[in-house]
Amino acid sequence: MLKKLIALNVLCFFALVTSAQPGNSAAIMARKQVPVVCYHQIRDWRPKDSKTAKDYIIPIAAFKQHLKMLADSGYHTILPDQLYNYLKTGAALPSKPIMLTFDDTDLDQFEIARPEMKKYGFKGVFFIMTVSLGRPHYMTKEQVKQLSDEGNVIASHTWDHHRVDKYKHDANPKKDDWVVQIEKPTKKLEEITGKKINYFAYPFGVWKKPVLPELKKYGFKLVFQLADKRDADYPLLTVRRILDSGYWTTKTFSNSVKHSF
């Protein structure tokens, strides 16, 4: 009986020690989430824009007002390495941290968001869809390199925005979704920036648990979704973001940043 009690105590102690380790999933889930904001197009609405599209298209004046609010309110932008270290080890962050992210390589992110962020010393994360590089209304490789050189982070957003939960492997690399959508775009961005690509965002923000072990094999430190609940087993691969909706007033945006995380 005594041996059983000792063995039980040892197991309980081991479980407590394991759960307290800074890098495990339980510890990561226990840390307070940091606000992460997602942008797509930054331009004024057009007559043909649908109601749904307007959620993803923030008018220029609204974008500028929202960034000014963040600066006036004392927010400090952080980059993914800082967020990763905080989640893994509890490393310190600046007061009122926030991350600004931009999806899909839209040219207005370079022409409008970049100079506006510079006014306040803000940095951002740009999730690049490599099929779009150099196309009309999208950034060029040179512009992506410039963003990287200026201290922003370049990250992957697949080749052409296909949903990750639909990917399949194939003996032919040209037909293997993981090669086409993950491996090749990552290498392309590393060639452009001269830096390792450690971060990824799901197209449409969509993911399903069965893909997470496979995605983990590709070495991304953090993967970003939208506002769905994080996966308790893979919190680093399901980091939450909120859209800064084109419909939102500055007050609504401020409240969402404060209360969504």
Regions found by a protein language model. Give the residues of each.
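Positively charged n-region of N-terminal signal peptides that target proteins for export
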Residues: 1-4
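Bacterial N-terminal signal peptides
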Residues: 7-17
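C-terminal active-site subregion of NodB/CE4 polysaccharide deacetylases
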Residues: 21-101, 107-108, 161-261
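Proline-centered loop/turn at the N-terminus of a beta-strand
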Residues: 97, 123-125, 153, 221
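Acidic (Asp/Glu)-rich catalytic clusters
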Residues: 114-122, 139-157, 216
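Short beta-strand and adjacent tight-turn residues that come in two discontinuous sequence segments
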Residues: 127, 157, 223-225
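Active-site glycine- and acidic-residue-rich loops that bind
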Residues: 132-138
